[in-house]
């Protein structure tokens, strides 16, 4: 189906366009598309920046730009740097709501509403350019240009991956990924529109949301990533989605075999992995077999520098810096070239080590690297709920010993990490990548502070925080080496520092009153901390609770100068 045929067919469709908080038919969507397209044409808009949380609004804005001949620019996020980029590049900013921080015209979705559409309203389509940001391996944003015809061709290629048995059920397409990136754009937006499948409007970024939302529809497809799919556990109410999920599509990294097995057993039999990049589009897929299969339009060559690919969708040859081993029935990915390192004359694939440890029931996510200040390996590990329980029960040394032994079954001693850091979650971005600065800090800096999950000022004299105890707290070492708990003196240190951060305390308190430690504070505990200030009596009371259990409480007497200043 050409882009013109696709457009003509959808313009006549009576089917559902999107669903979620509210549903839209294709006819309703076409009315909004035509109205926005007319606005863009009337105002001679040549370049539009698009940033949306609502998938329906995004799709409408994209199609309106196609009709109006307006090129599209997709920021990966709304950082200050990207805001400046938009201001210097585009004529208008299209989003769910007006952004008053941008110094360019902004048009919210509420301004596009139109109630009627007829075939006579349909305009010619234009092969507009769509610009996406990608960080690649450097962490610095690059601009990648696609055009509308290429995006339609990508959708056509991808449609062949889904079995007819999946498509015939007309499943609703659910996504945990962002439409601001190539993966979300291709699969959530283009593929669903190409196949005429209804798209769920909201992004579902937690496993619980995917499960609950799946139950609301007869059949669904999940568009997700290993980052989220690796978090599924038996502790989730898996039964909610049973019988509702027709297929799971995953991209952005390798899906660990244990997670694939879990999905096959509890979610659905069709688990489809996609390999590619923003530059190349989708390159290969893997479904129910050990090896990857190239898409039909891909021509390729393998060298020591990686995998070079070219296609109708990527006419300039692109080098993917991944080590590849060809087999008779496909190929295997060994990981990025820069993630195959040499230690003591031994070639070691860091991805292979990660994949092996991902099989362990204690490991939810992992990143292994050569230590920034040494010649040995370091591992940054996010533990599963089971792993956290064992951490609290047995301690850090036992966890490391068990993971090393698990890895040693198939790896030489030189490949076993000597430096370990543990956490509850690795801070991956929407493309499943880690910021190199975060990795460096995690490996080199001791963990001494709590994680502030949320905070707000309730009133002028009451402040609330929700904090989490880090797994790998430096203060667990020594006296609390086996049974990890936060010493009382450290709890008080945190309280004073948090009061200083919210500007309630500058100097050291004069004294402490009515101090009580009632329950242990342990690794990964999430607690609420409430400060109440009495300026007349020159005191700040604090109470730390976990659910209904009191952990710590007391009062600080503050200097005269601070109570007067407040």
Task: Label each residue range with its predicted role.
Residues 25, 129-156:
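Conserved AMP-binding A3 loop
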